[in-house]
Amino acid sequence: MSGNVKLELRNLTTLYKSGDGVRNINLTVNKGELVTLLGPSGCGKTTILRTIGGFIPATSGQILIDGKDITHLQPEKRPTAMVFQSYNLWPHMTVYENMAFGLKLRKVPKNEQKRRITEMLELVKMTGYEKKYPGQMSGGQQQRIAIGRSLLLQPDVLLLDEPFSALDAKIRSQMREELRKIQTDLGITVVFVTHDQEEAMALSDRIVVMNKGTFEQVGTPQEIYNHPVSRYVADFIGEMNFIPMLDGSTKAVRPENISVSHGTGKDLDGYVRTIMMLGHYIEMTVDTDIGIVKLYITAEEAEQYKKGDPVTLTLGDYRTYSDHQSAAE
């Protein structure tokens, strides 16, 4: 194991009685890295996270943290802490009591408890909420407390299971920014689970795109977005047009990599179908012989077109897929 590796999964298999689960998973997470497991419901991402945390037993394989095998340790014996979507705060305890709970179990002296909790409340921007109960706070505030409580345990690896999915869009975006700042400032190693590609792209050092219990691609957000290795990844991440070719292959091109001009030409001809303002950019769809193609244009460009106009589309950067599993530039 490299000296920079904090967490390693070696041929990890976790199966349920139904036979579903994940098989032969191999992954390394470096110290201070935030790695996101991204995929649709049922792909196995939460199974992996809960297996790392010890909440689901591994069928075979190994989980190592700092080179030490923790595969068969109970959750409370592992150097990990987990934050759930449902917050898991004790409703009958105040914020302070919730945050002190784990420290008491670890027999941390009271003075040290108070010091750590005061510092953590400041870090998660919840100073002054010590005497409030969970039911008196918003979802975002409760999640701040849940994250702070986990960080108080000073875990080697922090596990986050879709922690922001119950929050509205604006609060979710704010919480993402705050988590990333805390993670970077403290140098914490994090494994994050989400089905939200925007969340994964915004937060992650690396993303693991999952499909039916396997890894489709592991890479930086830029690598995943710009160089998807399979049609599945290309379709799952961001917007993508799939254009069938005469030789049976498919061209995949993102809306921002298509340009439009008036009239007909040698590329892809069609007629303007819709022009929609989506904030700082305009989405245009064009009816062509091979189906509807989506592209993004500026507001200034949009003023030059109207529904029904004949146009020609020029494809910029694209990838060619010969089947569902491979791609070529």
Kindly give the residue locations of the regions a language model identified:
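ABC ATPase nucleotide-binding domains
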Residues: 34, 73-229
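The feature captures the beta-strand-to-loop junction immediately N-terminal to the Walker
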Residues: 38-40
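ABC ATPase nucleotide-binding domain helices that frame the ATP-binding cleft
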Residues: 46-49, 145
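Helix-to-loop junction immediately C-terminal to a conserved catalytic motif
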Residues: 53
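Conserved ABC transporter NBD signature motif
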Residues: 61-69
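Non-catalytic connector elements of ABC transporters
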Residues: 250-329
